[in-house]
Amino acid sequence: MTLLNRGFFILLSYFFIDGNINGKENRLHTFSHPCMGTIFKVSVHSEKSRNKVEDIVQGSFKIADEMDDRFSDYSAESEVSKFNKQESHIPFRISSELLELLTISQSLYHKTSASFEPAAGALTQLWRLSRKTKRLPDQKTLSLAIKASSFASLIIDRKNKTLTKKNHLTRLDFGGIAKGYTADKMLNYLQEHDLKSCSISAGGDVIVGNPPPGRLYWIIRINPFGDSNSETMRVKLSNAAVSTSGNVEQFIQIGGKKYSHIVNPKNGLGLTTNHAAVVISNKGSMSDALATSISILGKSGLKILDHFPNTEAAIIDLNDNKVTKSPNFNKFSK
């Protein structure tokens, strides 16, 4: 099945959420907040006053900032950065949030055959340098980073809430799950404060609660080109999440070869295959992490969905412009 023209890319800022309804009493309120290197956008349908809605939404943005303070590997003062500086074989005390994210990540690591690798910080740091210098890492440095980039190099003590690295080069990088996990937290907060009909978008991740009044679902349009004339993929969701991942939007060319910003933890280099993925799941953490994993694995990545109930995916092969979907993906198509 061919859906998209040649040259397709996912421009993550071009997610649109349709949820407008007529009527003065139940209004749509939208708020934005910069965090985690992107813009978190919250849309809410509510009969409450805008001031009351804004107070609640600001509380959800505070959660996003708190998660960024814990999980960012760009901030030297974050919890993750402090762990990354820790020497090997010395237990590091961790927060409940980091322990929870590690637990989720550990399950994903095993179920995705390690294509989701949150302990690949040494590789992502090395690849950031390569993107800056436009030179591939030397083989010795790359080999050491690959060896260190494994969840198996971590020891999690859940009782005492500590994390220990076996290899001093091991680094955490939650770039493939942090936004989705944070959006889950924000959604829970909003719904606990009686804002049931809401949506949160953050880069390539969108998570929604109850549909707008009078609707059965939210309609989310994924625009590949970022202009009104291009073809879109539309999905319908209620209390679910959708994430995208693609390697065409950001790439570098080294030695005449194109490399993605997405790192394959198996070889430590950016992807060279033209794949883009769309994943729908019941949690933002799941859709976020699996979108990256399936981008790395390609069409074979759809097989890992056997381990994830209530999850569907579509992968676009940009070499032949074809879309391969999991068996029940079309039930979300609009």
Explain the meaning of each model-derived region.
Residues T2-K334:
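Mature catalytic core of soluble alpha/beta enzymes
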